[in-house]
């Protein structure tokens, strides 16, 4: 009987050992299955994140193209600072240039490829870069005193035989530039003495003639410009007023001599 009891205990021990082994194997299998699921979850999550990033990049890309098109339609020539106001980065502008959608006119100014080119595109870029963050309509609404003047203004208004460039601009403050094709002169220009041409503030013929004298241009060319303007409705009274305002000293009066003679004021 004792021997039977011992055999029974030994059998139960073996059964318990088998149960433990099955439980251990089951636990290991469950753990491995859990690890596999976790790895699959991480991979799936990573794939979704990559797709999301790709989607966002594509959306940003098309958003930049749309914004650039809108800015170009509004401004024609536009600046890096104007683009930044529409959340268009420098990288996006550089990419558009490489892709052939944009043309770089000068440092910080662009135009859309395929649009009609104008002789004044470069001049427009230089003017906009004097206050790069503001749009043309904003500067037109609030006059800042910076205008195209002198020989450049005369060319734009077909007065005399002057070239468009080197470009000449007038500003109420001193503006320095290293660009050899652009010069600034410090002078006060009244808003009443400018006209907007091709999106640019240009001195009217009366003010342009006075500036040509102050810039020491050839007197014969000034008279030619005067005659051209006279045939297109020159405001001689306004011209007389401007000449008088700029003839306060003997030196200034000497500079104004071509116009004083033409107006019969000498």
Q: Model-predicted segments: where are they?
A:
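Short, intrinsically disordered or compositionally biased N-terminal tails of bacterial proteins
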Residues: 2-60
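Long hydrophobic alpha-helical segments typical of transmembrane helices together
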Residues: 249-266
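Short gly/ser-rich loop at a beta-strand->alpha-helix junction or flexible surface loop bordering the NTP-binding
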Residues: 41-44, 48-66, 72-81, 85, ...
């Amino acid at each position: 009987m004792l021997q039977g009891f011992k055999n029974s205990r030994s059998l139960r021990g073996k059964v318990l050992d088998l149960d433990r082994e099955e439980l251990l194997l089951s636990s290991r299998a469950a753990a491995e299955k859990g690890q596999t699921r976790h790895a699959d979850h991480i991979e799936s999550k990573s794939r979704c994140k990559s797709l999301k990033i790709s989607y966002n990049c594509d959306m940003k890309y098309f958003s930049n193209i749309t914004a650039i098109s809108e800015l170009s339609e509004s401004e024609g020539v536009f600046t890096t600072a104007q683009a930044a106001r529409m959340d268009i980065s420098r990288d996006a502008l550089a990419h558009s240039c490489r892709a052939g959608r944009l043309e770089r006119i000068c440092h910080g100014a662009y135009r859309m490829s395929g649009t009609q080119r104008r002789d004044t595109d470069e001049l427009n870029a230089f003017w906009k870069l004097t206050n790069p963050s503001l749009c043309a309509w904003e500067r037109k609404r609030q006059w800042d005193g910076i205008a195209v003047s002198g020989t450049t203004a005369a060319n734009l208004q077909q007065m005399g035989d002057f070239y468009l460039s080197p470009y000449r601009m007038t500003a109420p403050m001193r503006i320095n530039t290293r660009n050899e094709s652009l010069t600034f002169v410090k002078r006060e220009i009244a808003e009443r003495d400018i006209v907007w041409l091709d999106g640019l503030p240009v001195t009217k013929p009366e003010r342009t003639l006075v500036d040509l004298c102050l810039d020491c241009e050839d007197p014969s060319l000034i008279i030619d410009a005067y005659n051209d303007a006279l045939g297109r409705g020159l405001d001689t009274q306004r011209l007389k007023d401007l000449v008088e305002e700029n003839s306060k000293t003997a030196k200034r009066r000497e500079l104004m001599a071509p116009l004083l003679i033409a107006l019969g004021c000498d």
